[in-house]
Amino acid sequence: MALKLKRIEVEEKLKDLGLEVFTPQEFKGVFNVSLKRAANFISSNLRSGLFVKLRNNFYTIKDSHPDYFFIANKLYQPSYISLETALSYHKIIPEVVYGNTSITTKTSREFETSIGNFTYRHIKTEAFTGYELREVDRYKVLIAEPEKALADYLYFVDLKKVSLNDRLKLRNIDRSKLIEYAKMFKRPGILKLINQIYVDARKPPKIY
């Protein structure tokens, strides 16, 4: 007789194993059930509200899902947290950012879910560096260093994909390191933007 899967026990085991973001294949292996039974249990508990679908074949626990940075890392790989999300995390921009932005070497994608939006922007493989493993809310996540987050951001400003934020906080940025990361993109416009933001940083703050 097949073992009956109980919601509470399933939730606790997924948490204990660090599988708060999981696929049907992983669920099948953990609970030693057929792929069909795993899919049926997940489908049933999407309707009941235990699980949330993040994208095709990726799910999380609705009421106790892990940190958004951790979800972003797992949802689309390879990737690391960067751009506005990392700039806010490192306090380079003052705004609170809603949604999560990451860098990937794969095709740019966006996933809209009931727990938040996850955006991934493509860069070339040669520039896919400058990130580190950090502990955020008990989870180990890949996130851009401050200088790389800014270099990534200025790359997309130069491409006219995003607007330049006029309230960048550069006090803790290593300018030489920023320039080295910027050179990886081989776009002279990024170096001009770096000069511009440092000139702007010396001006008196605007009164809004």
Predicted regions and their residues:
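Short, low-complexity, intrinsically disordered N-terminal peptides in bacterial proteins
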Residues: 1-3, 207-208
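Short beta-edge/loop segments at beta->alpha junctions of small alpha/beta modules
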Residues: 2-78
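Nucleic-acid-binding surface
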Residues: 62-208
